[in-house]
């Protein structure tokens, strides 16, 4: 099965569950997974039930997709994500974001637990830039025109 076929199958599965056109995607990392419990009129789907979806193995990641209303907006929240360091391929790591795009979501907020000098527990930090030093990236492989150009403009990614 091609990546596009997997994306279409997963999108169709979620749409059949009532998950449609979220205004915002939330990828909730360690410490913020409970935010999904604030979502009203939730549709909750376990990762294990979603076709082509990876499995979250990090302690504290509930492994659930939650869709509904948060502050009057339709959101799709992911309680946990998949990490490259866990042995996942970039296809698995990026698959949830591709699904959000397939569902017509155009804005995604990614959270994670991070440490640094001068920051205490619970401090919010905003990423302004990044350098990819892992030796691979999700652009390797077939370019899916449905998801944009081969080399997207990243100059405004951290807004």
Q: Where does each model-flagged region fall?
A:
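Metabolite-binding pocket within alpha/beta catalytic cores that recognizes anionic/polar moieties
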Residues: 1-152
């Amino acid at each position: 099965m091609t990546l596009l076929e997997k994306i279409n199958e997963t999108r169709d599965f979620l749409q059949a569950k009532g998950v449609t056109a979220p205004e915002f995607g939330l990828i909730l990392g360690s410490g913020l997974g409970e935010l999904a419990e604030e979502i009203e009129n939730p549709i909750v789907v376990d990762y294990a039930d979603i076709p082509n979806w990876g499995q979250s193995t990090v302690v504290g990641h509930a492994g659930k997709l939650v869709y509904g209303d948060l502050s009057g907006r339709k959101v799709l929240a992911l309680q946990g994500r998949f990490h490259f360091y866990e042995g996942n391929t970039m296809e698995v790591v990026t698959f949830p974001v591709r699904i959000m795009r397939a569902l017509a979501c155009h804005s995604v907020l990614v959270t994670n637990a991070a440490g640094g000098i001068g920051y205490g527990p619970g401090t919010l930090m905003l990423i302004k830039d990044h350098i990819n030093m892992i030796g691979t990236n999700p652009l390797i492989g077939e370019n899916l025109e449905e998801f944009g150009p081969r080399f997207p403009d990243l100059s405004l990614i951290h807004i």
